[in-house]
């Protein structure tokens, strides 16, 4: 339990930021799983590309703003690109 007023404020700020960060990471996880599910179910190419684009945008945004490490964002983008390319070749 914080003993000082400033420590209480930092605790409140930290809790708010933690919640916000978790929500952003959850959104990213949902987008990545959506792309994976669409590829697995052989969905329409346009639908897969749209989901892919939104996932890439989210990865870029979170990497630049340091919600996730930029290298992790880059790695995930690369994995998604490979997945999409293999999917497009197969069809």
UniProtKB/Swiss-Prot annotation:
GO terms for molecular function: small ribosomal subunit rRNA binding; structural constituent of ribosome. Signal peptide: none annotated. Residues 1-21 have a biased composition (Basic and acidic residues). Keywords: Ribonucleoprotein, Ribosomal protein, RNA-binding, rRNA-binding. GO terms for biological process: translation. One of its GO terms (cellular component) is small ribosomal subunit. SUPFAM superfamilies: Ribosomal protein S20 (SSF46992). Residues 1-25, 70-91 are annotated as: Disordered. InterPro entries: Ribosomal_bS20, Ribosomal_bS20_sf. Belongs to the bacterial ribosomal protein bS20 family. Binds directly to 16S ribosomal RNA. This is Small ribosomal subunit protein bS20. The gene is rpsT.
């Amino acid at each position: 339990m914080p003993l000082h007023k400033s420590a209480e404020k930092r605790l409140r700020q930290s809790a708010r930021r933690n919640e916000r960060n978790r929500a952003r990471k959850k959104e990213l996880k949902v987008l990545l799983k959506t792309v994976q599910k669409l590829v697995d179910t052989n969905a329409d190419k346009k639908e897969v590309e749209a989901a892919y684009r939104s996932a890439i945008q989210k990865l870029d945004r979170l990497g630049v703003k340091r919600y996730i490490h930029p290298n992790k964002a880059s790695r995930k983008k690369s994995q998604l690109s490979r997945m999409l390319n293999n999917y497009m070749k197969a069809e």
